[in-house]
């Protein structure tokens, strides 16, 4: 039976680059946000790619959940999710005996300025910190937490630690990829993936924090409470 690794990320966390890392592994098949259409239909939220996503993917709950089932040929199935895509779904349908969960989170002072370039008025629902905290409580010891700050500052060390936590052999191929994109990219890639498409792999760097506008300070503080709780469980590298 195939193993499933479910990544639960927030926006602007580096989740696409992490998906690209796992896509380089010969033992792994990746899926890009298979629950996105269901999330859009269930919540009604606006996204730049909303119409394209709903045209390209089924938004029904049964169809969305069916995509999460490993194929007979799969050894490892890596599911890249946004954490808020659990909206309207039962945890029992997103977990199983062969599941491991990865929570990728980032300080809100790094997320909010970047996310506002795409979504003018972000909400707690958009940013996913509450969902990540909930997932950690539900998954317990089968969840590994990593921060975007650690992943970008020390990609080799963080990816090695993550592989160890997931009981996967380390593969150096995870550090590089071809410039351009991968076949598994969702139809929303043109709106969000420019940085990854113009890269050829991980380069250690420090993620910068921006200035959160005063009118978002309350939202920032709400997110920070959950981020700090998640950070306490982050893998050491």
What name fits each language-model region?
Residues 79-173, 187, 193-196:
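PAPS-dependent sulfotransferase catalytic domain
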